Curated annotation (Swiss-Prot):
It is found in: Secreted. Residues 1-21 are annotated as: Disordered. It comes from Cornu aspersum. Glycans are attached at N3. This is Dart gland peptide. The lineage of its organism: Eukaryota, Metazoa, Spiralia, Lophotrochozoa, Mollusca.
Length: 21
């Protein structure tokens, strides 16, 4: 997604429901 909570090794889903990168 465009806005996500992703970080290195972060599998948390962002507000759009996509896995963090």
């Amino acid at each position: 997604s465009i806005n996500n909570t992703g970080g290195s090794g972060n599998r948390r889903l962002d507000k759009n429901g996509f896995a963090g990168q």
